[in-house]
Amino acid sequence: MSEKTVRTLTGKVVSDKMDKSIVVLIERRVQHPLYGKSIRRSTKLHAHDENNVAKIGDVVTIKESRPISKTKAWTLVEVVEAAAE
């Protein structure tokens, strides 16, 4: 069987109040269809954090996984950069 490519994204943790869960803000740049100006668009994704290692402000990498709950279908891979305290 062929290896399936796994979607990974990098973003900033905006909430870690839930147990074993984090909310990650993913920002991307798109061009306006008519005027061509570069615009920031953002998406908030819920991710599974098994060991509660990520804190607010951390830059993290998440990967797509099977649905874990109603809103969670992403899993924490690593903390790329810890937040300055």
From Swiss-Prot:
Gene Ontology CC: one annotated term: cytosolic small ribosomal subunit
Pfam families: Ribosomal_S17
Annotated InterPro entries: NA-bd_OB-fold, Ribosomal_uS17, Ribosomal_uS17_bact/chlr, Ribosomal_uS17_CS
Record-level Gene Ontology MF annotations: rRNA binding; structural constituent of ribosome
Any one GO BP annotation for this protein: translation
Domain of life: Bacteria
Coiled-coil segments: none
Keyword set, alphabetical order: Ribonucleoprotein, Ribosomal protein, RNA-binding, rRNA-binding
Database matches in HAMAP family: Ribosomal_uS17_B
Assigned protein family: Belongs to the universal ribosomal protein uS17 family.
Quaternary assembly: Part of the 30S ribosomal subunit.
Described purpose of this protein according to its UniProt entry: One of the primary rRNA binding proteins, it binds specifically to the 5'-end of 16S ribosomal RNA.
Protein's name according to its UniProt entry: Small ribosomal subunit protein uS17
Species of provenance: Acinetobacter baumannii (strain AB0057)
Gene: rpsQ
